[in-house]
């Protein structure tokens, strides 16, 4: 039976249709938001996967180009690997729902959102995120939701739910929030240097809208929801737990307090191996149970140390930042480099400048068709002392790259002020937590070293939270162990003036406004400290670009002159390119960008274009090239693409019988422009520039 439910969301109808399509999935719904249609399905395996210590959830966001009336570009005319946008949206779907499955539930779960039609004013990503919650909630899959999601913009200090395409262009904030009725679960934001208070108000505004959507979903579940499958979780043997805890005594706590990450891991590994050997001998065949208890005890012991004793694994204070060092200009042939080291985390970021034709072409569902500023993040296995296959960027690498890109985007100069394509690549050389935020810092240093006139320096910091038995500890600059065992991962990037990017994932309920306010305030103090440390390496962008960077010159001509610069079949522009070795990009408004390998090539190309667009002036003298000899005169090119006629009578003061007696094709001669007739034809004179012959004195008659 087909059931339809409707509510208003952001001033537009939001419709959920169930029972019409994809009925064999355990949960499915069609979301209709304006003219945006998204089909979301949820399926789970019947049996759990044996031997797993994690929850095997996969979320996919399928972009179909027919949704916007496009045929895929390139040789293969079908959708293939997910776009960057699709990967990021899949992560947005995954992050808020993953913590809401029962502990110990290890069945395969797959959520697929397929975009079938797109209305640019009704975001398909938000539709997919809400749809995933509905599909899971109405299914028999044990999901402890529902969750809901909204996008928030800010124009003139006013917050807007799910802003339209036009409103996004004006907005100073791009915020996506997911949560339950009781708590915020996930935040993703980009902002134009907004204050902590403005960001926090926007999050709370979003949560009020989320509560309305969750109530709407709860009504749908009460009408059509299926009974949930029972999850059978094996309880830990309390006697075995007590024995393991007694065996560990203080040895585990001492190992956790080791400052060096590698040494700490080795110490914990040695103690765990000792415990496994002891209990394998005592209780043969129970190694798996003992190993599970050991993993839990590492978490319990670490969290207790932090909340009760205020001691972190590397003996730092809760708000203490690890030692920082910054360097620039360390690679001689690149356009800009920044090496940022914070504790045992180290990132090298390299900037490459290109002409505007190097901008990334985007063949997606949105209105954006190219991107001139790009950031890519690479996390090789050696950065954590491991081995694995390297088969292109992972979802995590794409997500971290996008976060860093968003953090710096408000600081990147517009193409009118800096007509270059900009690519940043952050190579994580060593990692013990906060590598994405180290990439923010390294990218700032690299851009400044490259001479990109950024509007301000940006630094990033990762914050953590431990909430244990009523005690709360907020941690600045978390390392890997604290990230894995904590309750919140909050990444904040910004300038001295405000926040430019924020990402938050919460693993527990009960994170209220006060906790977030404290965390953001503590992050600001840490961010300011990091910025001051970065200034020890470089304080402002270099005034000159690298000698190995392309030299881009901008010229503005009248739009009517564009055809003259291009010439018939591209003849004129290709001649300039061939003679100078430059690249030329011309826009419809008459803006011309010249990218040259050196200043001299740029100068020559610029002069050639200026001559082409220059209008001939009556009375001016030109040095021209004879391009054609006729019986009645010679055609002379005085400016590129502009030629005039020197009539035979204007070649010399004396009578000229044949033009060829005076001129030959290819000769360079000086001519004066005498007239431009109504048809635009140019009349030239060589004679006007020649001295008049002296008249012979009359002979005396004797």
From Swiss-Prot:
Its main location: cytoplasm. One of its GO terms (cellular component) is cytosol. It is found in: Cytoplasm. One of its GO terms (molecular function) is polyribonucleotide nucleotidyltransferase activity. It catalyses: RNA(n+1) + phosphate = RNA(n) + a ribonucleoside 5'-diphosphate. Mg(2+) binds at residues 483, 489. InterPro entries: ExoRNase_PH_dom1, ExoRNase_PH_dom2, ExoRNase_PH_dom2_sf, KH_dom, KH_dom_type_1, KH_dom_type_1_sf, NA-bd_OB-fold, PNPase. Disulfide bonds: none annotated. Transmembrane segments: none annotated. Its cofactor is Mg(2+). Residues 550-609 form the KH domain. Its EC number is 2.7.7.8. This is Polyribonucleotide nucleotidyltransferase 2. It comes from Alkaliphilus metalliredigens (strain QYMF).
């Amino acid at each position: 039976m087909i059931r339809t439910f409707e509510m208003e969301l952001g001033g537009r109808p939001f419709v959920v249709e169930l029972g019409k399509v994809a009925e064999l999935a355990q949960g499915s719904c069609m979301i209709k938001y304006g003219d945006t249609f998204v089909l979301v399905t949820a399926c789970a395996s019947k049996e759990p996967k044996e031997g797993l210590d994690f929850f095997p959830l996969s979320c996919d966001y399928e972009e179909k180009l027919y949704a916007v009336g496009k045929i895929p570009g390139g040789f293969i005319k079908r959708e293939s690997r997910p776009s960057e946008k699709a990967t990021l949206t899949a992560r947005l779907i995954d992050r808020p729902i993953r913590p809401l499955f029962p502990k110990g539930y290890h069945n395969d779960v797959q959520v697929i959102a397929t975009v079938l039609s797109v209305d640019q004013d009704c975001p398909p990503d938000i539709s997919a995120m809400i749809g995933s919650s509905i599909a899971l909630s109405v299914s028999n899959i044990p999901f402890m939701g529902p969750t809901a999601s909204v996008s928030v913009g800010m124009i003139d200090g006013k917050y807007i739910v799910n802003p339209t395409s036009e409103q996004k262009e004006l907005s100073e904030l791009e915020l996506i929030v997911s949560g339950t009725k009781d708590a915020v679960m996930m935040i993703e934001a980009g902002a134009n240097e907004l204050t902590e208070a403005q960001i926090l108000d926007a999050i709370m505004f979003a949560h009020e809208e989320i509560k309305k959507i969750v109530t709407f979903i709860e009504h749908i579940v009460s009408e059509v929801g299926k009974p949930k499958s029972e999850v059978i979780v094996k309880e830990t043997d309390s006697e075995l737990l007590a024995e393991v805890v007694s065996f560990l005594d203080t040895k585990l706590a001492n190992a956790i307090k080791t400052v060096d990450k590698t040494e700490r891991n080795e110490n914990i590994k040695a103690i765990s191996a000792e415990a496994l050997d002891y209990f394998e001998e005592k209780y043969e065949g129970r190694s798996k149970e003992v190993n599970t208890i050991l993993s839990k005890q590492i978490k319990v012991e670490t969290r207790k140390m932090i909340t009760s004793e205020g001691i972190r694994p590397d003996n730092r204070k809760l708000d203490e930042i690890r030692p920082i060092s910054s360097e620039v200009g360390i690679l001689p042939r690149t356009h800009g480099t920044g090496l940022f080291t914070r504790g045992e985390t180290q990132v090298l970021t390299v900037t490459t400048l290109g002409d505007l034709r190097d901008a990334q072409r985007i063949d997606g569902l949105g209105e954006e068709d190219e991107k001139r500023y790009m950031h890519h993040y690479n996390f090789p296995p050696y950065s954590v002392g491991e081995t694995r296959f390297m088969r292109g960027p992972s979802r995590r690498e794409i997500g971290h790259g996008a976060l860093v890109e968003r953090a710096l985007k408000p600081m990147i100069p517009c193409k009118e002020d800096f007509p270059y394509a900009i690519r940043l690549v952050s190579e994580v050389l060593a990692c013990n937590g906060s590598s994405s935020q180290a990439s923010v810092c390294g990218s700032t240093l690299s851009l400044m070293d490259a001479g990109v006139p950024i509007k301000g320096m940006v630094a990033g910091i990762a914050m953590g939270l431990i909430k244990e038995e009523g005690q709360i500890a907020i941690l600045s600059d978390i390392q890997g162990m604290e990230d894995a065992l904590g309750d919140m991962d909050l990444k904040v990037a910004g300038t001295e003036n405000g926040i430019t990017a924020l990402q938050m994932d919460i693993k527990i309920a009960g994170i209220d406004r006060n906790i977030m306010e404290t965390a953001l305030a503590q992050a600001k103090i840490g961010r300011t400290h990091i910025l001051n440390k970065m200034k020890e390496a470089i304080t402002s962008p270099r005034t000159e670009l690298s000698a190995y960077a392309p030299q881009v010159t901008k010229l503005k001509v009248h739009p009517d002159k564009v055809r003259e610069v291009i010439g018939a079949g591209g003849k004129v522009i290709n001649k300039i390119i061939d003679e100078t070795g430059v690249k030329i990009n011309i826009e419809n408004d008459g803006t011309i960008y010249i990218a040259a390998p050196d200043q001299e090539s740029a100068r020559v190309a610029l002069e050639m274009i200026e001559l082409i667009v220059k209008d001939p002036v009556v009375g001016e003298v030109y040095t021209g090239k004879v391009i054609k000899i006729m019986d009645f005169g010679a055609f002379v090119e005085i400016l590129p693409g502009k030629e005039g006629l020197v009539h035979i009578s204007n070649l010399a003061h004396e009578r000229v019988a044949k033009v060829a007696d005076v001129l030959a094709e290819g000769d360079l001669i000086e001519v004066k422009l005498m007239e431009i007739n109504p048809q635009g034809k140019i009349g030239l004179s060589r004679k006007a520039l020649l001295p008049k012959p002296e008249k012979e004195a009359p002979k005396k008659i004797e």
